[in-house]
A protein has these predicted regions:
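Gram-negative outer-membrane beta-barrel transporters
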Residues: 398, 479-483, 491, 660-665, ...
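Acidic, small-polar-rich N-terminal luminal/periplasmic segments of exported/outer-membrane proteins
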Residues: 36-171, 644
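Outer-membrane beta-barrel translocator/receptor signature
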Residues: 114-115, 127, 136-145, 150-232, ...
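Periplasmic-side early beta-strands and strand-to-turn transitions of outer-membrane beta-barrels
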Residues: 162, 170-171, 177-179, 191-287, ...
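C-terminal beta-signal and terminal closure region of outer-membrane beta-barrel proteins
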Residues: 2-4, 154, 689-695, 749, ...
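C-terminal beta-signal and adjacent terminal beta-strands/loops
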Residues: 422, 606, 706, 778-793, ...
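Structural signature of Gram-negative outer-membrane beta-barrels, strongest in the C-terminal barrel
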Residues: 239, 387, 397, 401-405, ...
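Membrane-embedded beta-barrel scaffold of Gram-negative outer-membrane proteins
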Residues: 330-334, 340-346, 351-356, 594, ...
Length: 869
């Protein structure tokens, strides 16, 4: 249902002709007059196998996007690639979520590795927070789909993203790019390439991106999500001789942004905090009609507030502060005509400020909060050695190497829960492991207390050490048949230390008793030892006095940190240590067949490659905190990929069609879900699904009907399903029963089953220069954003209850380039039809009963200018 009328933007869209594509041009700076004369597809070079090769000659499902294409499409951040790259999903937020073929990691916790490896000039970036790179001085981006466990190592069960920078060279050059747009968008990029002598070259680039956000928090009057990123990139290249070069880079990044606000809705009335446990919240005065939790969520609903507005209270803690520093050096030695050696060393540090991790209640009230309350520090040091060679007149091509990395992470997070109410009859029934009677009969005694510990402060210290050795070789059996074998062995040591401190229940009890309004607590430990007992309300009007509000007022947020001021008990401090080494081999084998020349028709079919690949990917296990149970071991996940594909150039190389069909088997897939610990506290934790599988197909089409017209299309269809996945029923576990739920019928979260893109780009040339118009169209099918079985049931009933129904986005761009080719001006619009679509965050229908929804960008438009020097 479209609740809001949206203004037309025909004046902006009218001058933009249909267009969409990944540009076929691989060079970073194509001259304007030369580009127009090319009526055939150019060769695209990629480094997916650690050596420069034609994309059409390698048995890997890869999409390559050049710097020209990024500018033509107006892509300023790699997150925008999700619109056109098959099976790729990227979500921005506190944790940058990158998914390929349904495989991804959605939390951003320091203890959990991502499943898509991101590489910057051969340097592995281990954390997801810094992986969404602004496209500053980028030469190309390659997206490798499917496990890349042999050459790229751990954390590539989904695939890899390889980002290559423009490198310093001998030609002095500079550029400036500036942009403005609605919502106070301001962008500035600038770079200069400056040689110092004949053998030493330097390059520097800056990026500043800011805007004021489009989503208003009515409680504060501030907008979110805002962009406020600044970065500086310095590079050098020393060509010491004809055979040896040394590249260095230094990167400094500063982020001061607000994350996206949310709206709240209730997907299930049977949730624990709504009707499941029949507990009261501040504002509830009738035990037979508990409405406060629902009303709190409704106060932050889109239906009540209107379009692009939220109500998350006066201190939602959405500020994201992240400082990043990176140093790297790459030495390349051409030992002989057939042998080269490369070494890559990197040092990386990050500091992230306090930030809200989750708001389970979803509304303005301060009832449940997960907050990182201290700075988080991350350090990593890595070294890689690559030996590339060939033999037998290039029939054998091989790569071998070693990889080592040490990473340290510190993470502080605090879980805070408001005091809640319960009637005496319900408490007695829960103590007997019985479901509560509803509605509650009149005349019951109100009690106040906690479901789970009121406050838990956790400090996580982690140290990860990775060692790996790898080799891969391709051999031409004959002119048409290539066999590739690869093998990698990875050893991953995980050391985790978790320190927790809980609230002082004796001090909380004294404050309640000291008020004179509450009696001595019961000894019924229904919700675990950390929760304490329940205290009867002694006021004259019973429930009509709103006893939960009276109790909650005794523990205000006096310091404004979005946490209740419960006293901590140092005697509850405990320390858990986990230390284990995980080892895994990730082999691969591939057979590629190239059609012989006598099968090819120069006009109809120009080249054709068919391949079959078997490969394996690995993601390390780790230790997960599970409430009072301390650290629990999470098994590694392993993916086995069976894939066949083809790559075809046809019709005098004016058409390129690449496709792949795959069947991927998952063992011990790592998933986050809502569960309980042994003391019956509700916890959000990782676990392993026994087995799951992915079956899918991908297709990319690029067609140049003429030198001025370019048509692109992409399609991905995936079927995700769990084969073995059971977990304890949450409500039964909370009341002390053991009942298992089969979740094998559920789909994977975040990734749609189907995605597609289609469009056309047209270019005119004349005395005034070159005018290029394009329109990008992208489509996503239904997306599930839930954590638990009840969320999936709500999603199946209606996708908008716990996900996002299918939607399409339309982007347009009109660019003029002067005859000299050194000045261009672009008018652009994104989401031209002003579509409203959800991009998360999460639905939890079994416990809190809320669906917290962040919304994608509304219609955006602006102007860009680029000047070359």
């Amino acid at each position: 249902v479209d609740y809001f009328a949206r203004p037309s933007l025909s004046a902006i869209a009218g001058g933009i002709a249909l267009g969409l594509s990944i540009s076929p041009f691989a060079n970073a700076e194509s001259a304007a007059d030369n580009t127009l004369q090319k009526g055939v597809l150019e060769e695209v070079l990629v480094t997916a196998r650690k050596r420069s090769e034609s994309m059409q000659d390698i048995p890997i499902a890869v999409t390559a996007i050049s710097a020209d294409s990024l500018r033509e499409r107006g892509i300023s951040n790699t997150s925008e690639l999700t619109k056109s790259v098959p099976s790729l999903e990227i979500r921005k937020g506190q944790a940058n979520q990158i998914y390929i073929r349904g495989i991804g990691e959605r939390t951003g916790f320091a203890r959990v590795d991502p499943t898509v490896g991101v590489y910057l000039d051969d340097l592995f970036l281990p954390r997801s927070d810094g992986q969404l790179l602004d496209t500053v001085d980028i030469a190309s981006i390659q997206v490798l789909r499917g496990p890349q466990g042999t050459l790229f190592g751990k954390n590539t069960t989904g695939g890899a993203m390889v980002v290559s920078l423009q490198k310093p060279d001998a030609e002095p050059a500079a550029y400036v790019e500036a942009g403005v747009g609605n919502y106070a968008q301001r962008r500035l990029k600038a770079g200069v390439n400056w040689p110092i002598g004949d053998h030493f070259f330097t390059r520097a680039a800056i990026n500043i991106t800011k805007d004021d956000g489009y989503f208003e928090n009515v409680a504060t009057g501030q907008n979110n999500p805002t962009n406020d990123r600044q970065s500086l990139l310095l590079q050098t290249r020393w060509e010491a001789s004809e055979h040896f070069s040394l590249d260095t880079q230094a990167f400094l990044g500063k982020i001061r942004e607000n994350l996206s606000g949310i709206n709240c809705s209730v997907p299930s009335q049977e949730a624990l905090y709504i009707q499941g446990l029949w507990v009261a919240h501040p504002g509830d005065t009738d035990p037979a009609n508990l409405r406060a939790f629902q009303e709190n969520c409704d106060a932050n609903s889109r239906e009540r507030l209107g379009d692009l507005k939220s109500n998350q209270g006066p201190n939602p803690r959405l500020q994201k502060d992240l400082d990043t520093a990176l140093l790297a050096a790459t030495a390349d030695w051409q030992i002989s005509d057939t042998l080269s050696l490369k070494s890559v060393i990197g040092l990386r540090g990050e500091k992230e400020g306090p930030i809200q991790a989750s708001d389970p209640d979803g509304g303005p009230a301060l009832w449940s909060s997960y907050i990182n309350t201290e700075d988080s520090d991350r350090r990593s040091y890595s070294f890689e050695l690559q030996l590339n060679g060939s033999a037998f007149e290039q029939r054998l091509r091989y790569t071998a190497g070693l990889f080592a990395m040490q990473e340290t992470n510190s993470e502080n997070f605090t879980v805070s829960n408001s005091i809640r109410g319960i009637d005496s009859q319900t408490l007695a029934e829960l103590a007997l492991s019985q479901s509560p009677t509803r509605p509650v009969p009149g005349g019951t005694v109100p009690l106040v207390g906690f479901i789970g510990a009121p406050l838990v402060v956790s400090d996580f210290e982690l140290e990860n050490t990775t060692l790996a050795a790898f080799t891969q070789a391709s051999f031409d059996i004959n002119q048409q048949l290539e066999l590739t074998l690869g093998y990698r062995i990875t050893e991953e040591q995980r050391q985790s230390e978790l320190s927790t401190t809980e609230a002082d229940m004796a001090a909380i009890e004294q404050r309640l008793l000291g008020s004179g309004l509450f009696g001595n607590g019961t000894n019924i430990g229904v919700f675990g030892p950390g929760a304490g007992g329940f205290f009867p309300y002694l006021g004259p009007l019973g429930w009509r006095d709103d006893p939960v509000s009276i109790a909650a007022a005794l523990f205000p947020d006096a310091d404004g940190d979005a946490l209740h001021d419960y006293p901590l008990d140092p005697n509850t401090r405990r320390k858990d240590i986990g230390d284990e080494t995980f080892r895994q081999a990730t082999p691969m084998v591939s057979l590629a067949y190239t059609l012989p020349d006598h099968w090819l028709d120069g006009e109809l079919l120009n080249s054709a490659l068919f391949y079959a690949t078997w490969s394996r990917g690995f993601k390390s296990g780790f230790f997960e905190p599970r409430g009072v149970d301390g650290l629990q071991r999470i098994n590694p996940e392993v993916v086995t990929n069976n894939e066949i594909g083809f790559k075809i150039d046809a019709f005098e190389r004016s058409v390129r069609i690449n496709g792949a069909f795959y069947h991927m088997d998952f063992d011990d897939q790592q998933l986050i879900a809502v569960g309980s610990d042994s003391a019956q506290n509700v916890v959000v934790v990782f676990g392993n699904a026994g087995q799951s599988e992915i079956r899918g197909a991908e297709l990319e089409l690029l067609w140049l009907p003429s030198s001025a017209l370019q048509i692109n299309a992409s399609l991905s269809i995936n079927n995700y399903r769990y084969i073995e996945f059971t977990e304890l029923d949450l409500q039964s576990a909370i009341v002390g029963q053991e009942k298992f739920v089969d979740r094998s019928n559920e789909t994977f979260p975040v990734s749609p089953d189907k995605s597609a893109s289609l469009g056309v780009q047209y270019t005119w040339s004349g005395d005034i220069g070159i005018v290029t118009s394009r329109l990008d169209l992208s489509y996503k099918s239904d997306v599930f954003y839930g954590f638990d079985p009840a969320s999936y049931a709500a999603f199946k009933d209606s996708p908008e209850k716990a996900g996002q129904p299918a939607y399409a986005l339309l982007d347009g761009r009109l660019t003029w380039q002067n005859p000299a080719g050194d000045l261009s001006v672009s008018a652009w619009a994104k989401n031209i039809t002003d579509e409203r679509y959800r991009i998360g965050v999460v639905a939890v229908a079994d416990s809190s009963g809320t669906y917290n929804q962040a919304w994608g960008e509304p219609r955006m438009f602006g102007l860009d200018l680029r000047q070359l020097f």
